[in-house]
């Protein structure tokens, strides 16, 4: 039996094979998975916002912000014996849950979360090997740290593996 | 005003004003469906953003979320959460024809549920506004039918920008005969919290 570890909003968790990392109900939030296929270790983050607003950037660094989540996970993964050059990334989430006419202050937050995640990965030189982002529905993720495969479940939609 | 600076007295006051607001909303709903609606005593949740999906009954619960912004003299978010079964039951009372097969909502059903949200939120904010002697108005409602976690992360965006805590005033309501029920959540902005408490005469 593999152990299951659940990741909440604005959290990230690191785990090694055969643990399964899960996160539930990603809407505009984005799920970022990093995997080292040799060390069979991975990290999964569930981020809420792309980056802190001005004046708030003195906050304690957490995976609440997409721009920090990748850095925090990489540091932790290296401590756990992973090699930065071997890491690969997968992204899911970043949906638009409510109709666009309503989006005023947080317009396009899902999309901005995805962009922030891609930028953070690029800064670290981590290749993005698969993604399932955007659209207008919520997703739950199951990340297998043995295979690196992510299973994406959504309401009324076929299960996706990537 | 920082959420963690709130005292028991503040929280009780919030429960009380919310109770009055939801009572008006329940009357409106009861008139709409022609059945009595009962309310539970409001609960105030002050919790980490990470814990919010649990308070909504679990991130994967399938719900209809109707979201409105509170605008005017105080700002915040209103979220009305109807479990799937409850939303369908409500629709069967509001719309004449039988529910079509499949569990996606039609345009007409979405529109009807948004209108319910609008009526509930307007009644709630009218009562709250009268109590505060302030003007509070709801924005145009939007709706999402999905996993609770995916529906609510949108509501947490503004709160997440300024802190890690969410303050939610929750009132559950039930139909007396029909299996209609749901949760009414008010999530005031930290700044507006001061305005609300001040307006109802609670010492800060």
Curated annotation (Swiss-Prot), chain A:
GO BP terms in the entry: chemotaxis
EC numbers for this chain: 3.5.1.44
GO molecular-function term, one example from the UniProt record: protein-glutamine glutaminase activity
Keywords from the named record: Chemotaxis, Hydrolase
Hydrolase listed as a keyword: yes
Highest taxon above the source species: Bacteria
InterPro entries per the UniProt record, alphabetical: CheD-like_sf, Chemorcpt_Glu_NH3ase_CheD, Cytotoxic_necrot_fac-like_cat
Family stated for the protein in its record: Belongs to the CheD family.
PANTHER family: CHEMORECEPTOR GLUTAMINE DEAMIDASE CHED-RELATED
Function: Probably deamidates glutamine residues to glutamate on methyl-accepting chemotaxis receptors (MCPs), playing an important role in chemotaxis.
Identification of the protein by name: Probable chemoreceptor glutamine deamidase CheD 3
Taxonomic lineage of the native organism: Bacteria, Pseudomonadati, Thermodesulfobacteriota, Desulfuromonadia, Geobacterales
Gene transcribed to yield this protein: cheD3
